[in-house]
Design a protein with these regions (language model features):
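Terminal helix-turn-helix DNA-binding modules in bacterial transcription factors
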Residues: 153, 157, 162, 166, ...
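Short hydrophobic/aromatic patch on the recognition helix
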Residues: 30, 178-183, 228-229, 233
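Short, conserved beta-strand element in jelly-roll/cupin
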Residues: 2-18
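Short acidic-glycine-tyrosine-enriched beta hairpin
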Residues: 22-36
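A hydrophobic/aromatic-rich effector-binding and dimerization subdomain
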Residues: 37-106, 125-134
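Short, Lys/Arg-enriched, Trp-marked, Pro/Gly-tolerant hinge/linker segments that flank
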Residues: 80-90, 105-116, 124-157, 161, ...
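Regular secondary-structure segments
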Residues: 12, 95-109, 152, 156-159, ...
Length: 251
């Protein structure tokens, strides 16, 4: 799915696989994944150990005062898509901080919003410190699913072209059924579901950044039927394309 806010997920226990845009990450204890607004993502959980996690969500505007304090470039760099493996010696610190944010989020009193803002600033500073001063904190993508990531990347970069399951199977020299099954297993998305989500993501951008007609945008994003585009857009975004364009709060 896609949403209009930042998601930071920290894994306390268990394992999961996160697919973001066109990359697959395997997360385990102490891993933190950053998902910016508009990124296509889905998580699947596996293993015998129950998954326990913190999920922190916040909107871009909540970062304004933090940007004014430590600089736009630093904040933007620290919140790019990716996974940080928090060193074991620092896990107590971040887990205590996340528990404090959870406590304040339950609305203790009129000071809670200020405590949440201060906690968010502390979390970002902690992440920046880990990124800049710790070795090997960045987690690489899952190499076991390299082929499915290549297929997802191709779709992500060529969404405006005609793309079918048969075409992709031929291009990557695998059977249609194998591609369909493995893609779903690796990403959590069905092949067509992912393709449509990528196209809608780009349609959203064009609706807000251009004055192209909705019909033109549909064709620019790979849809060959503007009615189908409208139906798909409403199904994924919960709003018609023309209303989305008029109402940026719906993003």
């Amino acid at each position: 799915h896609v949403h209009p806010f930042y998601d930071i997920t920290y894994l306390i226990s268990g394992e999961c696989t996160c697919f973001v845009n066109h990359s697959i990450y395997k997360l385990s204890r102490g891993d933190l994944i950053i998902i910016p607004p508009g990124d296509i993502h889905r998580s699947t959980f596996h293993g015998k150990i129950p998954v326990e996690r913190f999920v922190l969500s916040f909107r871009e505007e909540e970062l304004n005062w933090i940007r004014s304090l430590i600089g736009d470039a630093i904040v933007s760099k620290s919140l790019k898509t990716g996974v940080i493996s928090i060193p074991s010696k620092r896990r107590d610190y971040i887990e205590t901080l996340l528990n404090k944010l959870l406590f304040e989020n339950e609305g203790q009193d009129i000071l809670s919003p200020a405590f949440i803002q201060a906690g968010l600033l502390e979390l970002l500073l902690f992440m920046i410190r880990c990124q800049q001063y710790e070795n090997n904190v960045y987690k690489e993508i899952d190499v076991d699913n390299q082929l499915m990531q290549e297929i997802a990347t191709y779709i992500y970069e060529h969404y405006d072209k005609k793309i079918t399951l048969d075409d992709m199977a031929e291009r990557f020299h695998i059977s249609r059924s194998y591609l369909s099954k493995k893609f779903k297993q690796a990403t959590g998305f069905g092949f067509k579901e992912y393709l449509v989500n990528v196209r809608i993501k780009n349609a959203c951008r064009l609706l807000l950044e251009t004055n192209h007609s909705i019909t033109d945008i549909a064709f620019e994003c790979g849809f060959n039927d503007s009615n189908y585009f409208g139906d798909a857009f409403r199904r994924i975004k919960g709003i018609a394309p023309n209303k989305y364009r008029r109402n940026k709060e719906a993003i």
